[in-house]
Amino acid sequence: MFIPNDRPSVLQLPKHEKDSTAADIKSIVANRDRRLIAVATNDAIYIWLANPQLLLCSVGVIDANFKETRGELKEIYWKPDSTSIAVTTNQCKILIYNLDLRDDEQCYNFTDSADPYFQRNSPELFIKGSRPTAHLHPTIIINLADIPTCCVPSRDEFLVCLQNGFTHHVTWTGEIIASLSFRASSIPFSVDQLQSKSENITSKSTYIFDAVYAPLLGGFAIVLSDGQGALLTSNDPNFAPNAILGVWAPNMKDATCCDVNHKFLLILFGCKNGDVCAYNIDELNGSLVQSFRVAPKVTNGPDLTNRLGPVHRITALANGYGFGAIWSPLSGAHALPRLVAVFTSFGAQSFCNLEGVVEEDQNDRYTAIEWGPEGFQLWLGTENELMMQPFVRSASCSSPAMEHCDRAVLMSDSQVLISAARDREAEACAPHSVWDHITVTHEYLSSNWPLRYASTDRNYKHLVVAGDQGMAYCSLSNRRWKIFGNETQEKNLLVTGGVFIWNDDVIGVVGVAADTDKSHLSFYPISQRLDSRYASVVDLEHKSVMSVLRDDVCAVFDISAQITLYKLTAHLETGRDAFTKVSTEIVTVIRINEIVPHPTCIVSLQMTQLNLDVRGKLSPAFYSSIDTVLVNISGRLITLSVNEDGKLHQPMVIASYVEKMWHDRCQVSQSTQSQNQDLPWKNHRRNGSNVSIQSVSTSTTSEPSSPMNQSCSSHLSNALWIACGAKGIKVWMPLVPGKRNLATQEMTFIAKRIMLPFELDIYPIVISAKDCLAMGVESQLQHVARASRNQGQMESITMYGLHRNSEVFVHHLLRQLLKRNLGVFALELAGACRSLPHFTHALELLLHGVLEEEATSSEPIPDPLLPRCVAFIHEFPEFLKTVAHCARKTELALWRTLFDVTGSPNALFEECLQLKQLENAASFVIVLQNLETTEVSMDQAARLVKEALEEKKWTIAKEMVRFARSIGSEDIDAFFRTPPPSAKTSLSRRPTVSSPSADSSTEFVINRFQAGAAGGRLNKVRHSQSTEQKDAPRKDSIGGSSKDKMALSWGLSGELSPQLATNRLAAKMTSILEDHAWHLLNNYWLLDLGFFWSELQFDLLGLLETRRKQISLSPKTTNENCFLIEDFALALTRLHAQFSWPYPLIGSQFVHQIEKKLGNIRVSQSTASLNGLLNDSLDNIKKPKARKLERTVVDLNGARSRIRETDIEASEEDVEIQEAVLERVRGSAVELAPVIDRSPSTSSSMNHHAPLAPPSPSSCDSRSLAGDCYQNTDFLVGEKSSRGNLQSSHQLELLLSLFSQTATIDWIFLFCLLSRDERKLRQEINVSMVRRAGEKSFARVRFACSELSRWAVEKCCGYVALLQAFDAHLAVVAEQAGCADLKFSPDNENRKASQKTSADDPKRGRRRADSGSSKLNNSFSNPKLNGMNGGRRERSRSADRAHKSVKRYDDVVCAEDALEKANEEGCSIM
């Protein structure tokens, strides 16, 4: 795989005449080793050095008479030894130039200045590579009878084709060999080389337009002037005219150019319609068989391909791993931008320059193309300029062992790029673009450019690279490079078969010694410097061209078509410099010369284990766990295995058109893998449809886990993955259904494999079988703006960046198995993949692909796959989610087909409601709106909204309301909305993209939590969830996540306007929302009301205004009409629970005030803890005896219960008596300094188990709702009383501002009391507020203050002093408003009835009351009780179902009486 990287280099061509026009590049050709690049324009020849890009020499045609007589230059050709070049013209001439290269003389030499400041000190500034001087000398001009069309150079002569139909053999000295000349019309052509009858071309004017020498195919690939393609073969090595036979390329009538891929034995033809067609030779009859036919694809601009003209030129890589092509624009159409594309060997497109291009007015086009050394450079010529684009390729092209890496490893001419580890990709903001760039040290690269081999160890600790000579390796942890210290040793080592790292501490090199020309296998220890003294050298019989490593076995393939397997053994060399020595032992020698046409045709070589155990008996193997050798010969994947007699089985071709292959057993054996990793399949056990595979290792095995929990099934771990270019991906999967013999308890396997083809949108370079992911790399065009050199203007430059992409393929495998009626294996495979995060998305892709293909088919399908696919998905709990998502992303015309198989959408909707899958139910509502009647869809939508509101799925409710309001009244009344699909419906394929998983049920993204405009933008509903993510249980106010509470603290200003109902469904939704808002307000769920207000953009201001008017008109009506606060104590306790707001502690000064009033009293340990005085010591108090006491506990919903416990004897340090004077705070007359306490606040018995008590707002690091006003109440409630955090304070502040706008005075009073904010109380409750709210409402607040005072005495004395201060302010306001004499007398019967309704109505608050009570019960109960009965937790009670032993605060007359009564009973002050 070759893709561009970085930006291209534009090279300037010097002009030989002042008045000459811009260079019109006609041809670019590289010499044999591709170090020299020859460029021909219409009037000049240039010789460039490939690296660095230096112009060595140039020759220009200046004489006008010469141009007229000889013509303009056209094509240029190299002599194989690079000593001469031949140039054709358009005037029947061929010019031959001699090239004089002098390696002993270097050009472009730099001379350092005498000034030391201008001298080169860095080694990168010195060019060590060869820069020979070059001189072109014209020697021969060959006159021809007609214009030459093409030439084919060889060592002693070159073939010249003319437009008159003749073809001549011309020597490099200018002589024409007349005896070997022939005419195209005299050549017999046939469709094969054996049986068919040959015929000559009838037209005398037909000539050879283009020709390429194909020695491994036995002749020349040609293109005739009439567009036909053929292969010229001959049994005569000199190609005598009488021995030539032409073989037609079938169905090739519009060829324009051709080239040959020697490694894969392919003939490439460019066509007039823009396609590239490839042919290979059939070994049976010698005919040409079409391998593939491809055309460039532009994902983001398919209209550009409509202007595609003929292929102008095509060129294959020298190593055969790809080819590039350029196109001409279509005549008569709009100008096509410059187009160049690169494909893999079998036609998979890896790069097209039109992806992401900004189309501009470009009049020029690419006129020439040529590859540089090793394919790392692509030279392109246009009508105006010459450019060179750098490329990178996969490291596995030259190192087969790198095919099985779990990371993407790419290499350029001077760098190695390694992708980040999968487990570390989450740390990067753009992990797909992060690469580890390892630049090879300049000391090695300057004389050995370019890189040819690169390899890493399995743990990516070391990297070894090799260029022309020697090698170098790097420690990836510290980026330190090591090269040969002796330069002679480096130059003596010529790497021919690759490099590898064995055992993480030894580097293996397969090469040739330059001085002796003998091949050897050398090992160098990493612990020592690179030196021949420490090398372990093994002589090889023949020159080796490829090597591969697996475990402790190294396989070497040499030019005699022999594979030798060496067993490697390491031992420590003793001595002062101890280092690792490696000894080898030949295990197996495999000769395959009969099936290998040439050593160049070997693409890759792998050792693996394919055969599975049969009844516990190991299959025959070459060595240990190596029973199969895989050889890719020109794209044919052949298996070599041994029989029980030690002889080779007949070689078997398992796949054709193979470019790459992956197999988990190729890099490491299963036994080694089981030792390194804790794999769950060491034994085989059949359990239902779940299968695991037994390891070959004989180590001790343990009971395996279910394959449902395995990360990779045995099918995938033993599968062979094959990339076939344009033909897609194939997987050779074993089918291993295990059966347990109850009598013998032996394992039996059905040793069968099946080839499953499928296609991917990317070209994979890494296949991760355990994750079912294919990783690819693409080069994306990026436009960068920079300042221009001319007048400071901005200009745009383009460059390419490498980006990794991944694709899921498990749905392709499931589909192929279901298609072949292998549902049992599909269930096994899916069961093993259920833990994958993209499994649900894979099921969706499976259903969507089958549905779209079968529903849009114009022909009836005899055996439809959709019913089988639906039945398969129904086996998994993700069935409803899969169907819902598939329906949402599919055209409406296909819904009928889908739900005819899956069942009625109404039934699926009901099932979603039962399973609380509200996200999926929302998708089915949209389906119902299009398929069912109006009444059905309206009823179901209303049910869903109600359920979503109860479950606090705010986003679902919001989207359903938005959906209802978006429907026009004329649409909702229409009965038929979606016609049934036609059988001939033609629909475009829409990609299904998995939306990110998110639990948005309580995601309180505040965009409108304050009086905000209702016309704000609404977020999309995202339904996708990960496989592990189950439907979250309903969360109450105190069970909500911190994310919900933090979001509640956001807000923005504006006026909230109600949405206008435009249809019946929208009106019904509005009614539901109003009912739910009343429900939340009546049950005192203010936090949920805030979320409800924010997410659904509800007109809460209008609702509260309605409430205010009803209360002002008739404040004594029932709670069902005006929603009064009937139980202020219950409302206060629920506010504490919802906002995680701690209860106030009694102040020490307040204790002294009571102490003075009541005399010496005994304070229990709980009271001392309540006051934060547990660590103070007193000497004047006697130790009280242990005694029984009753302590009252308040739960979440205000329920009271008395718990008996034995109070431990308090020590003298448990109590403290202080004196203080209780003064009324008027305004800010009393200013107290803030108390900074960084120690954790002392908890009372009520909040001992409060989870994560927030820090005190009095801390200098905290910020509170009331600001400095907390300082005025600290002496009342205790300096160490903790308050809510900043987040809760903001939430309270937003709600308080809302209630202030609507004069909701009762809730204003409770919020000020909760936040202990007397200053806020004075700001909010004043004379103007009383007039707005009404005197009767204000009288009710004063009554509530007295009621809460009675409750505080019994339940929480920390509120007693605070309520006294609040009551004093209310009295002042009443006096100023002239309503001091107005009293509020509640209707006892109505109040008791409402209390009973609140407790007994299961629809109005039981769920919310019970949902969070257990959590707060832990916070308010005695810690000793939590450990009773073996950790059994007592079930909390609702406030309205209080225990009968609890005394209601209605019986309490006043605070003084309560204190006296408590003293008589021996109770402590709470």
Curated annotation (Swiss-Prot):
Its main location: membrane. It comes from the Eukaryota. Keywords: Membrane, Repeat, Transmembrane, Transmembrane helix, WD repeat. Residues 1028-1045, 1385-1403, 1431-1447 have a biased composition (Basic and acidic residues). The chain crosses the membrane at residues 1294-1314. Residues 689-707 have a biased composition (Low complexity). One of its GO terms (biological process) is retrograde transport, endosome to Golgi. Component of a guanine nucleotide exchange factor (GEF) complex. This is Guanine nucleotide exchange factor subunit R06F6.8.
